[in-house]
C-alpha cells in the first residue's frame, strides 16, 4: 500500500500517484510553479483570468484504496489578483466574493474516484459566500519525474471544474460576464528527500 498525507501552503487540491520505488515521507509544494486561478468570459470576446495568491490545503491519498483518499483546501478571498487593482477591489465586495463577511473559499472532498490511467475525479463541496454546493474536479497527474536541478522526485498535477457563479449569489452583470466560471489548479510538488539521480544534472535552474 502507498499512502501519504500533506499539510501545505500553498495548496494541493488533487491526488498524485506514488513515484515507483521511492519513499514519500515528506513532500513540499514548489510555490513558483503552483497556481490556483479562474477564467470567465467577458462579452464573449475574451476570457479574463485571475489567480489567488494565498491558500492552504491538506491531502490524504491511498493508491491501493482510493476510497480512503481526501482533499481539503482553503483560499484567502482577499488574495485575488486579476492584474487590475480596481477590479480586484470590486470582486472582494458584496456583489461578488463578499470577502468581509466570508473571507475564505473552501473545498472539502467527499470522494476521490479513479477515471482511468493518470486521471481522477474529485467530488466535494465548494463553499463560497457562505454557501456550499457540490462540485467535481477533473484531475490529471501530468508527470512524475526526477527533478534535474534539485535531485529529488517531483510530480505535476492539474485540475479543473466549472461552476455557475449565480448559484452562489453572484448575479451581477449576467450576460456581459459569463455565468460559467472555470476554476483551475496547476501544481508542482517535490520530495523533501534528496537522492542521486541517474540522469545528468543541468547547469542551473530556470
Question: How does the language model describe each region?
Answer:
Residues 1-11:
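Bacterial N-terminal signal peptides that target proteins for export
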Residues 21-206:
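Low-complexity, acidic/polar, glycine-enriched regions of mature
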Amino acid at each position: 500500500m502507498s499512502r501519504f498525507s500533506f499539510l501545505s501552503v500553498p495548496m494541493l487540491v488533487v491526488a498524485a500517484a506514488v513515484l515507483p520505488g521511492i519513499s514519500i515521507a515528506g513532500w513540499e509544494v514548489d510555490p513558483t510553479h503552483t497556481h490556483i486561478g479562474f477564467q470567465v468570459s467577458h462579452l464573449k470576446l475574451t476570457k479574463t483570468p485571475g489567480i489567488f495568491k494565498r491558500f492552504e490545503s491538506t491531502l490524504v491519498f491511498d493508491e491501493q484504496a482510493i476510497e480512503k483518499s481526501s482533499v481539503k483546501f482553503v483560499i484567502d478571498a482577499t488574495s485575488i489578483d486579476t492584474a487590475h487593482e480596481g477590479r480586484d477591489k470590486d470582486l472582494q465586495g458584496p456583489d461578488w466574493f463578499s470577502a468581509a463577511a466570508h473571507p475564505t473559499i473552501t473545498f472539502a472532498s467527499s470522494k476521490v474516484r479513479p477515471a482511468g490511467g493518470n486521471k481522477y475525479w474529485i467530488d466535494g463541496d465548494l463553499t463560497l459566500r457562505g454557501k456550499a454546493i457540490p462540485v467535481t474536479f477533473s484531475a490529471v497527474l501530468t508527470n512524475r519525474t526526477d527533478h534535474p536541478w534539485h535531485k529529488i522526485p517531483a510530480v505535476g498535477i492539474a485540475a479543473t471544474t466549472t461552476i455557475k457563479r449565480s448559484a452562489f449569489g453572484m448575479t451581477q452583470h449576467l450576460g456581459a460576464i459569463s455565468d460559467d466560471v472555470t476554476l483551475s489548479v496547476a501544481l508542482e510538488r517535490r520530495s523533501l528527500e534528496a537522492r542521486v539521480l541517474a540522469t545528468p544534472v543541468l547547469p542551473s535552474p530556470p
